[in-house]
Structure formats: C-alpha cells, structure tokens
Amino acid sequence: MKEEIIKTLKEIEKERDITIIYACEFGSRSWGLDHAKSDYDIRFLYKWNKMSDYLRLEDKNDVIERNKGEMDIVGWDIKKALLLHSKNNPEIREWLISKDIYIEMDKNYFEGFSECDPSVLKQHYTGIINSDLKKKQKGQEDKSLKRRLYDIRCILCWHAIDKGLSPEIKMLDLIGQVDLEDKLKQLILQIIKDHKSQNQTITADDLSFIDKWIEDSFKMMVEKNKKLTYIKKDKEPYNKRFYDIVTGKF
C-alpha cells in the first residue's frame, strides 16, 4: 500500500506543479488504533515550484484534497503550515510527529521553532470531548468503541501535558506516559483490542465505567483549564523562514 500511496502523491506533484516536502499518516493508523477496514488518512506539505505562484494579487488555493479508494489525502501549502504552526495548531503538530512517514523532509522546515503551546493543546483535547458530550446531551451520542477511544486518547494527552510531557502519537506509548489505575488501564487495552479486531467483548457495565470516567475527567479538565496561561509566538521568524523557502535560500 505504501508504494501506491507514494505513486499517488507523485501524480499529484505532477498535476499541480508542486513539490511535496513531507507526507505522513494521520489519525487512527498513526495512533495505532486502526482495524482491517480503516482508511489511509494521508497528510502532506508542499510548496509551489514557481516563485510566481507566491507573488500574485490573489492567493492560490493552499489546500489540496484527493480521495482515491482507501486513501483520504489532504495537503497544505508550506505557507499555510508555517502560519498554523505559529498559531500553535495541534493538527500540524501531530502531522510532524507521526511515525508513519511516506515522504521524509530533506531538511527540517520547522527547525528552531518552539513546540506547540501546552495550554493550547490542553484546550484542544478538552474541546473534542466537549463536542462529543454535547451530542450525547442532544441524544445524538456516538456509542462506538472508536468514539470512546478518541475521547480516552484526548484525556491521556491532557494528563501527559499536565505532567510536563509531550504526548506520544502512538496510543500504547501514550498510555505508558500516564499513571492509570490497573482496572482502568486494562479496560482501555480491552477496548483497543476489541476495536482493532472489530469484535466487541467488553461488557456494558465496563463501558458504563469508562463513560463515567470520561465525563468525570472532562469536568476536571475544564476546571483546571481555567488557570491556563497562553504563549503568543513571534511570527517574524516564520516570515523569514517562508521568505527563505520561496527564494531558495533555505
């Protein structure tokens, strides 16, 4: 499959007259939460081959999307990626730390820039759970193991950050970063196993236990988030990096 993915990315390069500078897996596969029928969520960064494409009165589209079979492909122009990185965007962070790489960077385009603000990450992961719980209140709850795993992952990321750690991308590595009671840890591992095998064996009582833990954790996160302070990044280093990339100095 990797060869087919790279072939498709090369086709996009040719069609759009771009150079893909980085490509990775994002989402369930990059987290180690995929199953046999999971799609491939491919994310890439690119730059236009012609400098003139960056020197226009109207901006060119900075997102490229392609759906092909099992592949869901999204690419961001390096200008967009740098801007979002300067704004502490959590998604670009996860792209850059993915361990499932299709095209390696020939140089680190984000070298010298600080990590994503931990406070922004905490709010991001809290917000995902908040959205799910609001749906539950409206009777639109997604009762799948997948949804629970995504909420669990958000909670574990929050706790890792609270310990001063950078959350690991792989779920099993992330579990290792966080202190969990043995019962809770075993239930989470069981949900992962059931989800990956698409064979639910976990009991309704155990799922109720997990659901209550998710809700209790969310309340705690919201309360502690009230004390967060935020770091605003200086955009000038990003502007210089973008200029150097476009002019070929980087």
At which residue positions do the language-model features occur?
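General structural signal for secondary-structure boundaries
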Residues: 1, 49-51, 77, 101-105, ...
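Metal-dependent nucleotidyltransferase catalytic core
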Residues: 1-20, 24-37, 43-95
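Short acidic/histidine-centered micro-motifs embedded in hydrophobic/aromatic stretches
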Residues: 26, 98, 174-177
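Short acidic (Asp/Glu) patches
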Residues: 63-68, 97-99, 132-139
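Glycine-rich, aromatic-lined ligand/substrate-binding cores of catalytic
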Residues: 92, 103, 158
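Short, glycine/charge-rich beta-strand/loop segments that flank catalytic centers
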Residues: 95-111
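Conserved nucleotidyltransferase catalytic core and NTase-mimicking acidic/glycine-rich helix/loop elements
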Residues: 107-236
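Acidic, carboxylate-rich catalytic segments that either coordinate divalent cations
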Residues: 231-250
